[in-house]
């Protein structure tokens, strides 16, 4: 996970349920990974493992700690992102139940601090302003409010470009 709900709440004050915030954070993580074509993998933390249920077994010392985000690749059944919930010297466990499989590649995913802060800003904007998208202005009596326009070149991925600019250094070329 790009950021825990508790970490997000330390940056932004909101009364939304933890489940809602967790789902939105997971969606933003996938959106950013697709947009940048960047997996944010730390290849120094990589091992081959066998999967049984939700437990990964490595032949050597495994490099993951509780709370780490991992990416499973070279897998026919379980490719994806998971969070480590328990770890020993040669095994680690994730919350999801997976299909049994041998010889998958597991790599730690590490997001830079500026990406985490950008995600916090994007989610804060989403919570506070998403409902106002499409409304250009409103007037009540002598009070008038004009909102940010989200058409044309002002928006990227459904967010104002000013909120997505932090991703530019992380975009990888795709051919």
Feature-to-residue mapping (PLM):
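Short acidic-hydrophobic surface loop/beta-edge motif
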Residues: 136-140
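Short helix-capping/linker segments at secondary-structure and domain boundaries
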Residues: 127-134
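Glycine- and small hydrophobic-enriched segments that form the cores of compact globular domains
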Residues: 142-144
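Conserved short "hinge" loops at termini or chain/domain junctions
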Residues: 1-117, 130, 153-175
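Short Cys/His-centered divalent metal-binding micro-motifs
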Residues: 123
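Short capping micro-motif at the N-terminus of alpha-helices
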Residues: 147-149
């Amino acid at each position: 996970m790009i950021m825990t709900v508790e970490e997000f709440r330390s940056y932004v004050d909101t009364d939304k349920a933890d489940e809602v915030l967790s789902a939105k954070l997971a969606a933003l993580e996938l959106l950013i990974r697709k947009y940048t074509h960047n997996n944010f993998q730390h290849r120094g933390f990589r091992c081959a493992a066998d999967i049984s249920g939700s437990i990964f077994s490595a032949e050597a010392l495994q490099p993951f700690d509780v709370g780490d985000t991992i990416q499973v690749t070279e897998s026919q059944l379980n490719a994806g992102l998971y969070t480590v919930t328990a770890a020993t010297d040669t095994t680690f466990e994730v919350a999801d139940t997976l299909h049994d499989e041998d010889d998958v590649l597991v790599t730690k995913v590490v997001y830079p601090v500026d990406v985490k802060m950008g995600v916090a800003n994007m989610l804060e904007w989403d919570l506070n302003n998403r409902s106002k998208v499409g409304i250009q202005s409103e007037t009540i009596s002598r009070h008038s409010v004009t909102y940010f326009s989200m058409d044309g070149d002002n928006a990227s991925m459904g967010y104002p470009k000013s909120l997505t600019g932090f991703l530019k250094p992380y975009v990888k070329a795709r051919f």
